Design a protein with these regions (language model features):
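Regulatory N- and C-terminal appendages and interdomain linkers associated
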Residues: 1-23, 31, 293, 298-327
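ATP-binding pocket architecture of kinase catalytic cores
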Residues: 25, 34-149, 153
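Active-site acidic catalytic loop and adjacent metal/ATP-binding pocket
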Residues: 30-37, 46, 180-227, 234-237
C-alpha cells in the first residue's frame, strides 16, 4: 500500500477496519483514487494528491460546499489530511452515466438526461443567488484569454503533436484570426455558474440519482457551456432528436429571460465548436505527452461534432478549409 495511505488510515483510526485498498481508474489529472473496503461500514474513496494540500483553500472543497447549497448531489467530504495530501470521500460506486447507458432502457436514458439537464438549469438559477467572491468559481471565467488558450492548446497538441501538422506562418495567422472571432463572441455573453466538465463520465449513478463529480474547475461562462458538455459529449452518442428535445427541456426550465430557440441553438453550436476543439487538444496531449492512448477512441466522435458545426455555418468556411486536412 502507498505509505501515505497507510499513515492516513492509521490517523483516521481505520486500520483495523480496513479489509482491502483498491486503486481506481483516475481521470486526466495527477490525482490518484483508491477505494477502501471497511468492515461493518460503507466503503470510502481516498483521493491521493501529488503532495501536501491546504484543505481550506482547495477549490474542490469550496465548490463542493457551493454545489451542496444549490442543492445538487455531490460526494460528501468525510475527512482529510493536509500533510499527507489525502481527502476521504463518500464512495459513489463505479457506475458513470456513460457506463450505465449501455444497460439503460430508453425510458431510463431519457429520465437520466432530463435530470442532468435539470441540474444545469438549477445550478445557473441558484448559482446567481449564491454568488459570492468567497467561492472560487465567481472569481474566474471563460474569458478571452482562457478560451484562446484552449484553442491554441488544440493547435499545439492535436494539430501539431498528434497529427503532425506543419503549419505555415500564414496558416497560423489565419487560425488566430478565426479564434479571435469565436472567443470574442463567446466571452461577451452573459455569464452563469458552469461546472466546466459536465459530461457523462463526471456524472455518477448512485442510490437512483445522478451525482456530480470533478467540479473543482467550476467557473463563470456562457449559459450554453455545460449543456454543450453534456449533449456534444466526446464519450456518448446522442441522436439529433434527443439533443433537440433536451435543448427544449433546458429552455423550458431555464430561469430569467428565455432566448428564442433558434438564437440559443446558434450560440450552442458556437460553444460546441470551441469546446470540442479543446477536447481534441486534450486527447492529443494525453496521447503524445502522457503516453495514454485510451483517449484515441473518442477522437472520431469529437471530430464529427466539429465537422458538423463547421459545415453548418457559412461563417466557418475559411476555418473549415484550414482544418480540413486534419479532420
Amino acid at each position: 500500500m502507498e505509505p501515505r495511505l497507510e499513515q492516513y488510515l492509521a490517523e483516521q483510526q481505520l486500520t483495523a477496519q480496513t479489509q482491502q485498498v483498491m486503486p481506481l481508474t483516475g481521470d486526466a489529472s495527477d490525482r490518484q483514487y483508491f477505494r477502501v473496503l471497511l468492515k461493518n461500514a460503507k466503503p470510502i474513496v481516498l483521493a491521493l494528491h501529488a503532495g501536501p494540500i491546504d484543505f481550506g483553500s482547495m477549490p474542490f472543497v469550496a465548490v463542493a460546499k457551493l454545489l451542496a447549497a444549490v442543492p445538487v448531489p455531490v460526494p460528501r467530504i468525510l475527512h482529510h489530511s493536509d500533510r499527507l495530501g489525502v481527502l476521504g470521500l463518500e464512495d459513489l460506486g463505479d457506475v458513470t452515466l456513460q457506463a450505465h447507458l449501455g444497460a439503460a432502457t430508453a425510458t431510463e436514458h431519457a429520465a437520466l438526461y432530463r435530470q442532468a439537464v435539470g441540474f444545469i438549469a438549477l445550478m445557473q438559477q441558484r448559482g446567481e443567488a449564491l454568488r459570492s467572491d468567497a467561492y472560487p468559481p465567481y472569481r474566474i471565467a471563460f474569458d478571452v484569454e482562457k478560451l484562446t488558450w484552449e484553442l491554441e492548446f488544440f493547435v499545439k497538441h492535436y494539430l501539431q503533436a498528434y497529427k503532425g501538422a506543419a503549419l505555415t506562418d500564414v496558416q497560423r495567422e489565419a487560425l488566430r484570426e478565426e479564434w479571435s472571432a469565436i472567443v470574442e463572441e463567446l466571452a461577451s455573453e452573459p455569464r452563469v455558474l458552469c461546472h466546466r466538465d459536465y459530461h457523462s463520465r463526471n456524472l455518477m449513478l448512485h442510490d437512483d440519482s445522478l451525482y456530480i463529480i470533478d467540479f473543482q474547475d467550476a467557473r463563470m461562462g456562457p449559459d450554453t457551456y455545460d449543456l454543450v458538455s453534456l449533449l456534444r459529449d466526446s464519450y456518448v452518442d446522442l441522436s439529433a432528436q434527443q439533443v433537440d428535445g433536451l435543448i427544449a427541456y433546458f429552455l423550458a426550465h431555464k430561469s430569467g429571460d428565455v432566448p428564442a430557440e433558434g438564437e440559443f441553438r446558434r450560440r450552442f453550436d458556437l460553444m460546441a465548436l470551441q469546446r470540442n476543439l479543446k477536447a481534441l487538444g486534450t486527447f492529443g496531449y494525453m496521447t503524445t505527452s502522457r503516453n495514454n492512448t485510451v483517449y484515441i477512441q473518442y477522437i472520431p466522435r469529437t471530430l464529427a461534432h466539429v465537422r458538423t458545426n463547421l459545415a453548418k455555418y457559412p461563417r466557418f468556411e475559411r476555418l473549415l478549409g484550414l482544418l480540413e486536412p486534419w479532420l
